[in-house]
Amino acid sequence: MENTEMKKIIDRQRAFFHTGTTLDVSFRIAALKRLQYMIRRHEKEIEAALLLDLKKSSFESYMCETGLVLDEIHYMLRHIRSFAKEQDVRTPLAQFCSRSYRKPSPYGVTLIVSPWNYPILLTLDPLIDAIAAGNKVILKPSAYSPACSDLLAKLIHRYFPAKYLTVITGGRSENTALLQQHFDYIFFTGSKTVGREVMRQASSHLTPVTLELGGKSPCLVDESADLALAARRIVFGKFLNCGQTCVAPDYVYCDEKRKEALICELKRQITKQFGSEPLKNPSYGKIINQKHFERIRRLLNPEKVIFGGNVNPDTLQIAPTLLDHVTFEDAIMQEEIFGPLLPVITYRTLDEAITRINSMECPLALYLFSKKKENIEKVTAKCQFGGGCVNDTIIHLATPYMGFGGCGESGMGSYHGKDGFETFSHTKSIVDKKTWIDLPVRYQPYRPVKKWLLKKVLG
């Protein structure tokens, strides 16, 4: 698509925005219900597209994509009217006879750039929040998940007018061309490298951004943890979608006294959840493409594999794999793994672990398995991270009642539920001053008595 054509789409959306149509909350509710209907009506097509792109099972497609999207819509439909209401706030004495209030307003024309790993969820979740806030949206799904991207384009264009919502497919050239346009807000989910470029391009128009990136999310297991339960939940969170989850536990960081017992439990759980031959499990997915398959395989040091390690280049599959004797200097610890490889590293003291985690880039997530309240308080207070779980993994992502987002190198801003509505809204602070009285204190000429009165109401 040419730059001029993109600009025409944006101009049409901006013109539609200025009609004020989407300021009506009833219009937004109708749009959310239409999106809800679209997803339910075409659930089987969505499932088939996810199977093609990522070999996702029917169960996983609903649990991790379609179901979560429908849950977000359901939540937003219940709360949108209260979110969109003007909110009265207190007025200082110096401004008496006034009404002070905060008014949520849509930004206008927004761009949502989504990734390939959860191509339905991570495209439609921010779209729901943007619609609820009253924006127009251009969606740019990933070229790496073509079946899902093409399906989204077909469905969105069938159910919504392009002046309101539209999908632009394509690869790097389309991304580059889009980022050169003037948007009122940009929401990006993806790699840190591209995130920096998004922010750089947005700065030329002073466009605000939300960046949902990634990082090496640690999974701490202390000496008090229930190892059987920890292993079960770590294996679930790590190997879901073949480890291609932005909040997957990147590595296990456990108390050195519990390592051997934990490894035994991890091995047992991998076999229990995926079978003795995971690559033959019909519900086990695949790596998205050859490029990422080779990247992950380069991180797989055979000398450090203690479980798994099998690969199938023909199907782009890598079995759930445990690695031991890994150091923080190893290649696998220099980048986000984003695949089914799980290093197990030990610490001697919890303070040592906290210091090490804080010496690294801020992770998108952190997980702690512990029964000790003091350890839970210490880790959640002292470690820098976007969000996380205590005694579980990744489930903090799956709730509309809390915002989800990163910090530092793992991103900025948040979304889901009310946080998502606020992300796509500019809140105007307004004072409505009454006209029946106008005290002269603030006006020149200034006199000592005016300053005396001023000191009574200020400070």
What is each stretch, according to the model?
Residues 1-101:
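N-terminal Rossmann-like NAD(P)+-binding subdomain of aldehyde/semialdehyde dehydrogenases
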Residues 6, 25, 43, 227, ...:
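Residues at or immediately preceding the N-termini of alpha-helices
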Residues 17, 21, 36-39, 43, ...:
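Structural signal for hydrophobic packing residues in well-ordered secondary-structure cores
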Residues 23-24, 220, 271, 318-459:
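Conserved C-terminal structural/oligomerization subdomain of aldehyde/semialdehyde dehydrogenase
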Residues 28, 73, 134, 165, ...:
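Residue-level signal for inorganic ion chemistry
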Residues 93-229:
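Rossmann-like NAD(P) dinucleotide-binding subdomain of oxidoreductase/dehydrogenase enzymes
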Residues 193-327, 390, 450-452, 458:
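ALDH superfamily catalytic-core signature
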